[in-house]
Amino acid sequence: MLDVFTPLLKLFANEPLERLMYTIIIFGLTLWLIPKEFTVAFNAYTEIPWLFQIIVFAFSFVVAISFSRLRAHIQKHYSLLPEQRVLLRLSEKEIAVFKDFLKTGNLIITSPCRNPVMKKLERKGIIQHQSDSANCSYYLVTEKYSHFMKLFWNSRSRRFNR
């Protein structure tokens, strides 16, 4: 009798118990909701005993995996700090503005006057406009974002980490 369950035990040995419990619950609810006549007719048509139950179990397993991945994705999204979300959504042009800051830690950024990228970053609250001089504007990286940039910057990928 134990030889029948050995392959199943090996299959589910690396699966989290929570996912296995979800699979069993989905499997039970699906079998309970599907009419008995349909199950009997399906197994009689295919002439393979218990095929319908095996298919429903496989379906339950896939649904449980999908829901656990979806839940993990949603948790990961909502566990991010608001500042981290802003940094993750920066474009390549916006990240290029901070190249000097990320290398040296210099909080002052210079750019040509009326630069649209700088205006976007100012609206996002990442930088503050300090002064203008001949064809040049000076900006300061805010203290809050300078901390998060240093914390989440990955110099290898040249992106901010999650």
Curated annotation (Swiss-Prot):
Transmembrane segments: 22-42, 48-68
Keywords for this protein: Cell inner membrane, Cell membrane, Membrane, Transmembrane, Transmembrane helix
Family annotation (Pfam families): SieB
GO cellular component: plasma membrane
Intracellular or extracellular location(s): Cell inner membrane
Topology in membrane: Multi-pass membrane protein
Matching InterPro entries: SieB (IPR025982)
Name of this chain's protein: Superinfection exclusion protein B
Record gene name: sieB
